[in-house]
Amino acid sequence: MPRKGPVAKRDVLPDPIYNSKLVSRLINKMMIDGKKGKSQTILYKSFDIIKERTGNDAMEVFEQALKNIMPVLEVKARRVGGANYQVPVEVRPERRTTLGLRWLVNYARLRGEKTMEERLANEILDAANNTGAAVKKREDTHKMAEANKAFAHYRW
């Protein structure tokens, strides 16, 4: 924690094509070694693939996918009297979005398709249909929270 007080929150600029801060954040999450141009190209090609396959607006499909990935509950470790408990806590809206984007990118990278454009497009399509690895991650997170509901009174 900084001594000079809270750190000012940076606001991301919306991306040039879809004019969306959410898309801009996804581009930043995908970026490796500061290569933002490459990240943008991959994302826009993925959106083209989605539009081609579904016939729907890629932005709507992406928003639906993100909605299906974002967790509502998660567990946090809390030490009480020498024992660590996994305490279920509600996820703040900002963190929900961040986790959703992170899981989407991570599980897209782990997929088997040849190019990242295809991987990302397929992961977004799977998530929009409530399937895929990112949605499974959310379900697992919710299951953990449900299983540890007995420790909910340790919330802080």
Swiss-Prot record:
Example GO biological process: translation
Any single Gene Ontology cellular-component annotation: ribosome
Matches recorded under CDD domains: uS7_Bacteria (cd14869)
Function noted in UniProt: One of the primary rRNA binding proteins, it binds directly to 16S rRNA where it nucleates assembly of the head domain of the 30S subunit. Is located at the subunit interface close to the decoding center, probably blocks exit of the E-site tRNA.
Keyword Ribosomal protein: yes
Protein name: Small ribosomal subunit protein uS7
InterPro entries xref list: Ribosomal_uS7 (IPR000235), Ribosomal_uS7_bac/org-type (IPR005717), Ribosomal_uS7_CS (IPR020606), Ribosomal_uS7_dom (IPR023798), Ribosomal_uS7_dom_sf (IPR036823)
Source organism, top-level taxon: Bacteria
Family affiliation: Belongs to the universal ribosomal protein uS7 family.
Record lineage: Bacteria, Bacillati, Bacillota, Bacilli, Bacillales
GO MF assignments: mRNA binding; rRNA binding; structural constituent of ribosome; tRNA binding
UniProt xrefs under SUPFAM superfamilies: Ribosomal protein S7 (SSF47973)
Keyword vocabulary terms for this entry: Ribonucleoprotein, Ribosomal protein, RNA-binding, rRNA-binding, tRNA-binding
Assembly, per entry: Part of the 30S ribosomal subunit. Contacts proteins S9 and S11. Interacts with VmlR.
Xref: Pfam families: Ribosomal_S7
